[in-house]
Amino acid sequence: MTFSLAIVGRPNVGKSTLFNRLVGKKLALVDDRPGVTRDRREGDARLGDLSFRIVDTAGLEEADAASLEGRMRAQTEAAIGHADAILFMIDARIGLTPTDRAFADLVRKCGKPVILLANKSEGRGGEAGTLEAFALGLGTPLPFSAEHGEGLSDLYDAICDALPEQTRPEPEEDEDADTDFVEEEADDKPRRPIKVTVLGRPNAGKSTLINRLLGEDRLLTGPEAGITRDSISVEVTYAGAKLEVFDTAGLRKRARIEDKLEKLSAADALRAMKFAEVVVLLVDATHPFEEQDLRIADLVAREGRALVIGYNKSDLVARGGLITRLREDVDRLLPQVKGVPIVPVSGLMGHGLDKLVAAISSAHKVWNKRVATNPLNRFLQQVTDNHPPPAVSGRRIKLRYMTQPKARPPSFVLFCSRTDAVPESYIRYLVNGLRETFDLPGVPIRLTLREKGNPYAD
């Protein structure tokens, strides 16, 4: 039986370090300064034979509800409300603070099992703080070190004691029982969610858009630019489509990024792009389509991901011919993803979300598309009849055979003579022909030239 644990505590006590250790990956950003984590992040964790959901949360701070810190606290309280048990963490080196005491009262009132972790307790410096934690009235504190992995066996025992029903081993099934009544497995496997990463400049409205798709304020939003730091994934079902959507930090020009934490956030956003199948580039309609938007789109194309452009905050501008001009600019400046869908949306008002999800589903299908060999070679014959490759130094280039070895993105191999002599302009001509003939808008197309391995070689 699965269960969920929320890691809570004041800022900089080591919550994200523990989260990363339990999920076995460096998913959450970690830095020495307090307040790095803002949104709550979920992951699949393992500890011994236990499998469970773990939630990393923002550090608890006393703050006005309308402030950024107050909104972060509301996200943490929501995580406490959804969890089966709480891992309350303190910094044993520093000892108890008034903030620890205040939020221990909050956790105690939630009525859920609480496991008290005295983190950073390795060495003599942590002993006094561990003993001091008894005063919180949350039970016996566990000496722990998230950084070095000390105390994990004690944590395992504490989880089993706190959640005996959820952690009890499942009874083994008798393989011979009821064999005559076992139904065959269905051929159709459950459909996987489409992995979607939302990228854009700071304050483009990425988190607001995802919250609207979810139908709840799951991600931290506000007027401040640069609120999102970690890349947070959430599962969305909208208009019948299943999506796993990654929210990311806003991407500024590299030359403007000086802060170490912003560099980490940008790297995390680009890593999320590499996990994606479809990338939604969210453009702020109240600002012109800038060079940074083009850079992001070019990165997506070079990474081989399907692209959809969301024209956000479109309710705030008089659209008129804006979309037409944007389409012309994108096709001219980004020929490698010609025909990319451009969808006017409003994350705040909820306008256009059905069209955005439909565009994501369509782009995913195109990205996965395969073309049979016979149609490919009929295409090759037709384009070479209409426009044969130019002769180089008096010698004709022979285009012999084309095949598609892989999709995601559509990738083609052309067997020909003198691959080094084929002009780039002719390769672009072939790629554009493939895109138009086989209906491949908005995805990068890979075309590789080879001289050997042609099964129809002379």
Swiss-Prot record:
A matching Pfam family: MMR_HSR1
Entry annotated with the keyword DNA repair: no
Keywords: GTP-binding, Nucleotide-binding, Repeat, Ribosome biogenesis
Annotated GO biological process: ribosome biogenesis
Compositionally biased spans, kind Acidic residues: 171-187
Keyword Manganese belongs to the record: no
Residue span, EngA-type G domain: 3-167, 194-368
Gene3D superfamilies registered for this protein in UniProt: 3.30.300.20, P-loop containing nucleotide triphosphate hydrolases (3.40.50.300)
KH-like domain mapped to chain residues: 369-453
Binding sites annotated in the UniProt record for GTP 1: 9-16, 56-60, 119-122
Organism superkingdom: Bacteria
Primary role: GTPase that plays an essential role in the late steps of ribosome biogenesis.
Subunit structure: Associates with the 50S ribosomal subunit.
Recorded family membership: Belongs to the TRAFAC class TrmE-Era-EngA-EngB-Septin-like GTPase superfamily. EngA (Der) GTPase family.
Record-given protein name: GTPase Der
Organism ancestry: Bacteria, Pseudomonadati, Pseudomonadota, Alphaproteobacteria, Hyphomicrobiales
Name of the gene encoding the protein in the UniProt record: der
